[in-house]
Amino acid sequence: WLRWRHGQDREWLAATGYPLVAEVFRFYRANLVEGQDGCLHVPLSSSPEYRENQSAAWASDPTVDLALIRRCCDWVSEMEQALDRDDLSAAAEQVRARLAPYPLTDRHELCLWSDRPLDESHRHPSHLMPIHPAMDLTVDDGDDARQTIDASLEQYLALGRYRWAGHTYAQLASLAA
């Protein structure tokens, strides 16, 4: 998507970019399940590097997956518009509208997944994906979004740097910007 966004190369978009993103969307759509709440849910996935990928790291609706699916839906629509196509845009808009909301704590912090707030220092802030790089929650989205952004960053920083790696600092610099 970034290659398309910055280069605006329609030939590359038609031959490579759009087919790749369309296939990713089809995969997501085929693997989502409708819950009793009427929302579409990720049945099972993990939050990267949390709990060394053991069974405690696996659950439904990881925030990172929800953010990536939302962004993929946006990319499908944007790319189809650029290519004057309308193959998947309606389906992408429907999936995005029905996708489960981001799980939040009572303090409005983004969770790793439903009922699992970040509970330890962690080098991979994947649960912050809706803020950056997905940019699905921005300070321009109103008071609720700003509250979630502020609370989530404060929580991440409060848990300390014990398990951070070099890339963690770069990610947090991008988040803070």
Predicted segments, located by residue:
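Active-site core of glycosidic bond-cleaving carbohydrate-active enzymes
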Residues: 1-10, 15-18, 63-177
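Acidic/histidine-rich catalytic neighborhood
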Residues: 23-79
